[in-house]
Amino acid sequence: MNDIPKGRTKDDIKVREKLIKDFYAHWISEHPDKKVWNHDLGTFIYVKFLSINETYEKAARDYNSTLAVFHLTEILENAVTIDEKATNRKTKNQKQFEKLIILKYGEVKLTVGLQRSTQEMVQYCITVPDEAGSKNKATTEK
């Protein structure tokens, strides 16, 4: 994990994007059904192409969010619901969902969408909100 750049330059973000994409490719090879049972929701959370795209676009912008992605299975299994919200119909990636469910696992925020066509819960994005990332950074730098 030491080879993950911590900066916010375009080059740092590009490296983290590639690491996230490579991680998902490996994860899918180990989880060919592309789903994990979430204990709190009592249903499977599916990982789809949209999951990968949305996550690498958002998580790669922050070092702590990138680290969180590497704990994908653990997060999908153990995150607990904290909120539910309507989708933004003007956002292309959210149009396919009836609603978004916000879950937390430690400081990690997992957003899951209820897909209209299949009624499946689909991983939308994984991030560590800035406040949490700042706290973690302060703790690890002591």
Predicted features along the sequence, with ranges:
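Ribonuclease/tRNase effector modules and their secretory precursors
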Residues: M1-K142
